[in-house]
Regions:
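Amphipathic alpha-helical and helix-coil boundary elements used as assembly
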Residues: 1-214
Length: 214
């Protein structure tokens, strides 16, 4: 009889923090430091000694031949929850989701359970980049942090061939939580599907400032 497999005697669960997403095999795996299983002392357990965790994908992604959305969008510093696929052996973690919160302090790369990267080594981050606010996207909670930048980008008194002029309209953004559904990338590309009553919008924006809004 096979020993130590998921579901045999229930599941062995964990919560933890992602410390590495540079999977050498490019399978979307991440290294996770698990609360209660791993110490925060990196001299005892350095990041590179943590096991690679597989990331469970939704059924809208086939996990086959690149179909669907890949790779998983976890970053260093993400809090996650999962289980050990090999149960009590605890060498094959599987992540089933993330846990948002309200970070109260910036990461300390000298300790575990933090983004281990320093600013000079992080392409984006290190995370969190903001503290004392919700992990929800700012635009999803009604904070239009693009408003001032957009005002400077708006064109007005643009001439036309028939001698008339026109002006680019201001954004109708008036999002109310929890009805604005936002997807944002690390570099700043944004996609919004806003279901705020009487203010529904679709908005897609390139980090350079180019956008469309319906």
């Amino acid at each position: 009889m096979i020993q130590n497999f998921q579901g045999q005697d229930g599941f062995v669960w964990f919560t933890g923090v992602v410390e590495d997403r540079q999977d050498p095999d490019k399978l979307g795996r991440v290294r996770v430091r698990c609360v209660g299983y791993h110490t925060d002392n990196k001299t005892k357990i350095p990041t590179e000694d943590l096991p690679w965790a597989w990331v469970m994908m939704p059924t809208t992604t086939s996990s086959m031949n690149g179909l669907g959305q890949t790779p998983p969008f976890l970053v260093e510093g993400s809090w996650v929850i999962g289980f050990w696929r090999d149960a009590e052996s605890m060498q094959e973690p599987v992540i089933i989701g993330t846990l948002p919160g309200k970070p109260s302090q910036f990461g300390n790369p000298d300790f575990g359970f933090h983004d281990p990267r320093t600013e000079d080594k992080a392409v984006y981050g290190p995370y969190p980049i903001r503290i004392n606010e919700s992990d929800m996207n700012r635009r999803s909670v009604g904070a239009d942090y693009l408003a001032e930048a957009r005002k400077e980008e708006i064109y007005s008194n643009i001439g036309t061939a028939d001698g008339e002029t026109w002006a680019e309209p201001e954004s109708p953004y008036e999002a109310i939580y929890p009805y604005n559904h936002v997807y944002e990338t690390e570099s700043g590309h944004i996609r919004e599907f806003d279901d705020t009553k009487f203010r529904t919008r679709i908005h897609e924006r390139h980090r350079s400032g180019s956008y469309y809004e319906i």
